[in-house]
């Protein structure tokens, strides 16, 4: 039976790949959080109307992106722990649950951001400033003219460009989070031997690798202790 090409986790290179994916998720999650914070501080806080309602673009671009970024960091940390503890089933199940939730959230975030970008491009950014410019829903009226322009606390001509400049990288980050979370799901299923990615003998190979790594770690620790003792003795002789 031919295995799916997505089931690429093996005993030789799988743990190192999982560690790299965890580090990438932590990095991408922090970048997405930063983009969401900058987007809120520079653009989207201006488009909240006085009644407390917000535009759909705000909800899609800020709330979901921030949630996806936070969860991506958590999945990355669990992936790092799982890559160093390959024989602990609870970590595998936690990784599977968090990665699956983050996969769905990242896909929803990507689709929402794509919708927000499409709507904003289609109406030329007028939907973003509709509360500040009630009369500018007419595409024939320039953004820097029309009723309500003098009451705006920000420059309406920069809202459109700034929003797109931050939304598009956030969209790419969300797509990357979805792909990395999908790999974590595959790795967790493979480690547990569940689904089409099940590999016979994988647990035995991992146990052998763990047994081989333990003497090496102990040998390295002993060598470090010997080096430290030699340095201490050399320093004592120099003082004498």
From Swiss-Prot:
Keyword check for 4Fe-4S, yes or no. Answer: no
Alphabetized UniProt keyword annotations: Membrane, Transmembrane, Transmembrane helix
Q: Tell me the InterPro entries matching this sequence.
A: Beta-casein-like
Transmembrane regions listed in the UniProt entry = 21-41, 63-83, 94-114, 163-183
Membrane topology, from the record = Multi-pass membrane protein
- State a GO cellular component annotated for this protein: membrane
Q: Where in the cell is it found?
A: Membrane
Q: Tell me which tissues or organs this protein is expressed in.
A: Expressed in skin, pancreas and keratinocytes.
Which Pfam families does the record cross-reference, listed alphabetically? BCLP
Q: Which PANTHER family match?
A: KERATINOCYTE-ASSOCIATED PROTEIN 3
Which family is this protein grouped under? Belongs to the TMEM54 family.
- Name-wise, this protein is Keratinocyte-associated protein 3
Q: What species is this protein from? A: Homo sapiens (Human)
Encoding gene per record = KRTCAP3
């Amino acid at each position: 039976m031919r295995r799916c090409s997505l089931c690429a986790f093996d005993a030789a290179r799988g743990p190192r790949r999982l560690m790299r994916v965890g580090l990438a998720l932590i990095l991408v999650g922090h970048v997405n959080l930063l983009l969401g914070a900058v987007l809120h501080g520079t653009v989207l806080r201006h488009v909240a109307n006085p009644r407390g309602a917000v535009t759909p673009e705000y909800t899609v671009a800020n709330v979901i992106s921030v949630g996806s970024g936070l969860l991506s960091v958590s999945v990355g940390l669990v992936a790092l722990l799982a890559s160093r503890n390959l024989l602990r089933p609870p970590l595998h199940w936690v990784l599977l649950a968090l990665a699956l939730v983050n996969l769905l959230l990242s896909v929803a975030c990507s689709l929402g951001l794509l919708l927000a970008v499409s709507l904003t491009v289609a109406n030329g950014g007028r939907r973003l400033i509709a509360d500040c410019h009630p009369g500018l829903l007419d595409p024939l009226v320039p953004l820097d003219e029309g009723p309500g322009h003098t009451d705006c606390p920000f420059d309406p001509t920069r809202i459109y460009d700034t929003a797109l400049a931050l939304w598009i990288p956030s969209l790419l980050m969300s797509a990357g989070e979805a792909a990395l979370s999908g790999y974590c799901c595959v790795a967790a299923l493979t480690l547990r031997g569940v689904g089409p990615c099940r590999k016979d003998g994988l647990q035995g190979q991992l146990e052998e690798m763990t047994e081989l790594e333990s003497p090496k770690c102990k040998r390295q620790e002993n060598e470090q202790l010997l080096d430290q003792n030699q340095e201490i003795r050399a320093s004592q002789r120099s003082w004498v």
